[in-house]
Amino acid sequence: MLNPSRFRILAIGKVRKSWIQNGLEVYRKRLPGLSITEIRDGDIKKESRAIISSIKKDELLIALCEEGEKFTSMDFSHWLQNLGSSRIVFAIGGTNGLSQEVKTSADLCISLSALTFPHEMARLILAEQLYRAISIAKGSPYHRE
């Protein structure tokens, strides 16, 4: 079964929009144990070092980038379930995205959509998709096809 404590989100920069902060708070409550860490934005090389240095040996790094693999919500849930008990860190870039170094270091690059979203919104969308993935795994009526 999927457990929110297996997931960490590393995100560059702060969320400045209150409505996004409010949305994230909703999903933090729905996903107890989900960790969201903000990394100070600035030089993309420093951001990259901060992301890569925070990954533990037993964690998988998943980079969110527009050219990444695309999933349906069902496929995303099944993919997460198939990872077993692995701890997963999702890296979300700031205004300049993620460096090639982070993308190359990642175990996988995924895309939330063919559309481009502000990095603050990407956090909220990812949190919702993690909640949806867990709901699918539990057979909850939250996800409807």
From Swiss-Prot:
EC class name: transferase
Organism: Prochlorococcus marinus (strain SARG / CCMP1375 / SS120)
Annotated family: Belongs to the RNA methyltransferase RlmH family.
InterPro entries: Alpha/beta_knot_MTases, RlmH-like, tRNA_m1G_MTases_N
Keyword Membrane: no
A Pfam family recorded for this sequence: SPOUT_MTase
EC number: 2.1.1.177
Binding site for S-adenosyl-L-methionine: L64, G93, L112, S113, A114, L115, T116, F117
Summary of subunit composition and partner proteins: Homodimer.
Name of protein: Ribosomal RNA large subunit methyltransferase H
